Amino acid sequence: MGRRKIEIKRIENKSSRQVTFSKRRNGLIDKARQLSILCESSVAVVVVSASGKLYDSSSGDDISKIIDRYEIQHADELRALDLEEKIQNYLPHKELLETVQSKLEEPNVDNVSVDSLISLEEQLETALSVSRARKAELMMEYIESLKEKEKLLREENQVLASQMGKNTLLATDDERGMFPGSSSGNKIPETLPLLN
């Protein structure tokens, strides 16, 4: 007799939900470990609980190395998608430029009607405003990504500074113990200030 199928839906009882989360998380991590061993692959698992607690596990390489490789590959895929999107955006502009060029290369360019020229001018202005709007949007996205990188670097800087402070404190404690007659009332050395 096999297991009965469990309907996949949200578990209403909070304690049952927590127990199920814990068991399934451990099962998922175990399966990832098995996949890594059997297939000799690098596997990283990141799970965030409903309460916001982070669980991660990696086998083979360090989890940060695996994520870095993923980001590099994903960035290449995003660049390819971005190029396809740009091509799709430029096709109407290309057609418009070809229309303008054909109008201007007509043998009787002086006989082109005013309405036709006004229409071409409006199309060019529309294309130009769309291009400028897209450029502004891309610049804002770039600025936001730089702000996010700055935030991450500041956080990393704080972590490193606090680690340096702990290491400096440990080193001075060790030095105090090495010298006879040193008092415990020595001044604690200052840590390096954070970069602003």
UniProtKB/Swiss-Prot annotation:
Induction: Slightly repressed by vernalization. Negatively regulated at the chromatin level by VIL1 through the photoperiod and vernalization pathways. Requires EARLY FLOWERING 7 (ELF7) and ELF8 to be expressed. Up-regulated by HUA2. The keyword Transcription regulation applies. Residues 175-196 are annotated as: Disordered. PROSITE patterns: K_BOX, MADS_BOX_2. Probable transcription factor involved in the negative regulation of flowering time in both long and short days, probably through the photoperiodic and vernalization pathways. Prevents premature flowering. GO terms for molecular function: DNA binding; DNA-binding transcription factor activity; protein dimerization activity. The lineage of its organism: Eukaryota, Viridiplantae, Streptophyta, Embryophyta, Tracheophyta. It is found in: Nucleus. Keywords: Developmental protein, DNA-binding, Flowering, Nucleus, Transcription, Transcription regulation. GO terms for cellular component: nucleus. This is Agamous-like MADS-box protein AGL27. It comes from Arabidopsis thaliana (Mouse-ear cress). GO terms for biological process: flower development; photoperiodism, flowering; regulation of DNA-templated transcription; regulation of flower development. Expressed in most plant tissues, embryo, seedlings, roots, leaves, stems, inflorescence, pollen, siliques and flowers. SUPFAM superfamilies: SRF-like.
